[in-house]
């Protein structure tokens, strides 16, 4: 497990606001100033202050593809650094300058620094010269308006190499109204990913969910097949 994650972490996972509560106040903040405003004002209930426990497990168990990896909506950069290694170069992507400044401040002196980078770009329009072997999405799908999900799937397809892998941590699987975060289901991922050329390799419960998210998450692993 990456030592930097433990030093930077300020949350034990118990104070993360459940989606049914976040949905009551976060939309107003997003509407007023966007995600940048959230980061400027410190209204980031989705930020665990450390790497996602599932990501740490996948890294420690050598269960992630090597090569180039992308973490869209990387925020404070915790998962980016957890994934980074000499065999895996990770790009953390976000539209918030404040989020990326925080990430750089936290991890700029990390021993892993040469194995990751942070980029301020729009996931829906950014197309780098080199594609990715792996993309990990936890927060983008549930944060965007539901009508944008087909465009999300299209971007995933265009950013992955042939036979690349998309890992989705599906959250929140709840019945709450409104958002962000907007409620999701396995079918909402299937409905947009399968038509563009993805195949589900596995859909499983997340045994490493933090306390407030237990029973509300599933791990999906998808392969780009055409």
Curated annotation (Swiss-Prot):
Gene3D superfamilies recorded: Vaccinia Virus protein VP39
GO biological process: methylation
Residues binding S-adenosyl-L-methionine: 35, 39, 46, 73, 94, 122-123, 138
Tissues expressing the protein: Ubiquitous.
Entry EC number(s): 2.1.1.n4
Catalytic activity: thiocyanate + S-adenosyl-L-methionine = methyl thiocyanate + S-adenosyl-L-homocysteine
Enzyme superclass (EC): transferase
Keyword annotations from UniProtKB, A to Z: Methyltransferase, Phosphoprotein, S-adenosyl-L-methionine, Transferase
Gene Ontology MF terms: thiocyanate methyltransferase activity; thiol S-methyltransferase activity
Modified residues (Phosphoserine): 85
Coiled coil: none
tRNA processing listed as a keyword: no
pH dependence, entry free text: Optimum pH is 8.
Function, as annotated: S-adenosyl-L-methionine-dependent methyltransferase. Probably involved in glucosinolate metabolism and defense against phytopathogens. Highly reactive to thiocyanate (NCS(-)) derived from myrosinase-mediated hydrolysis of glucosinolates upon tissue damage. Also accepts halid ions as substrates with a lower affinity.
PANTHER family xref list: PTHR32183, THIOCYANATE METHYLTRANSFERASE 1
Family affiliation: Belongs to the class I-like SAM-binding methyltransferase superfamily. TPMT family.
Protein name per its UniProtKB record: Thiocyanate methyltransferase 1
Source organism per UniProt: Brassica oleracea (Wild cabbage)
Gene assigned in the entry: TMT1
């Amino acid at each position: 497990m990456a030592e930097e994650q433990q030093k930077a972490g300020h949350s034990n996972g118990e104070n993360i606001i459940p989606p049914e509560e976040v949905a009551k106040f976060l939309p107003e903040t997003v509407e007023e100033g966007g995600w940048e405003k959230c980061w400027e004002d410190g209204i980031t209930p989705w930020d665990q202050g450390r790497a996602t426990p599932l990501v740490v497990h996948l890294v420690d168990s050598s269960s992630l593809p090597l090569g180039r990896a992308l973490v869209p909506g990387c925020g404070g950069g915790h998962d980016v650094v957890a994934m980074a290694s000499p065999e895996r170069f990770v790009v953390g992507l976000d539209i918030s300058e404040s989020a990326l400044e925080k990430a750089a401040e936290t991890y700029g002196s990390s021993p892993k620094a040469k194995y990751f980078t942070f980029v301020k770009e729009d996931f829906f329009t950014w197309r780098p010269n080199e594609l990715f072997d792996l993309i990990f999405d936890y927060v983008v799908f549930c944060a965007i308006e539901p009508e944008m999900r087909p465009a999300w799937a299209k971007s995933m397809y265009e950013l992955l190499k042939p036979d690349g892998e998309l890992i989705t941590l599906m959250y929140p699987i709840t019945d709450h109204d409104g958002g962000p975060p907007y409620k999701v289901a396995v079918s909402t991922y299937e409905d947009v990913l399968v038509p563009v050329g993805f195949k589900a390799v596995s859909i499983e419960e997340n045994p490493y969910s933090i306390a407030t998210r237990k029973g509300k998450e599933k791990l999906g692993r998808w392969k780009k097949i055409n």
